[in-house]
């Protein structure tokens, strides 16, 4: 059976069909319901909200009092010789009450949903590409350091430390080369007087040792009065 839907408006439609086999009953069963929850819920008669009986001599019917901008699920059944009941189904969409519907412009809700999903996916892709571009720009502008001939210079030549500038380890070695002097401590007066005498004796011993090495003059010890 070939079912055709024509003259669809926001509250009605005309359904016509051409039977391929004769109907054994006296009438056709025209069943339809709004398809709000599911596209297909079975061919059982109690699933349909509306049912009309049309004599088998009539091959078209006008449906009225339909909801605007609603998808309808329609089936036509008739008892035949081969099967107890044969169901032939189709779907149609009523028009909207807006002025665009009067001019013949109809937008499928499923198409609108796909368009909305495509727009959201494009926005997400654009944001992700922008974040990746910003990260790549930051990586490109990072300073790249290179060490050449004892000096550290930036790859683009903006910052440079010449060779004459001593490094940190060299400065520590220079500081280690300086002699260390012991700071005077606060001692008693007797120890302060003994220090010049000890220095004088040390000087005398150095003079004697120097004279022995030369060998030209006899060693003469200096005499200090007590």
Curated annotation (Swiss-Prot):
<feature type="transmembrane region" description="Helical">
    <location>
        <begin position="113"/>
        <end position="133"/>
    </location>
</feature>
<keyword id="KW-0472">Membrane</keyword>
<keyword id="KW-0812">Transmembrane</keyword>
<dbReference type="InterPro" id="IPR003961">
    <property type="entry name" value="FN3_dom"/>
</dbReference>
<dbReference type="GO" id="GO:0016020">
    <property type="term" value="C:membrane"/>
</dbReference>
<keyword id="KW-1133">Transmembrane helix</keyword>
<feature type="domain" description="Fibronectin type-III">
    <location>
        <begin position="1"/>
        <end position="101"/>
    </location>
</feature>
<dbReference type="InterPro" id="IPR013783">
    <property type="entry name" value="Ig-like_fold"/>
</dbReference>
<dbReference type="InterPro" id="IPR036116">
    <property type="entry name" value="FN3_sf"/>
</dbReference>
<protein>
    <recommendedName>
        <fullName>Fibronectin type III domain-containing protein 9</fullName>
    </recommendedName>
</protein>
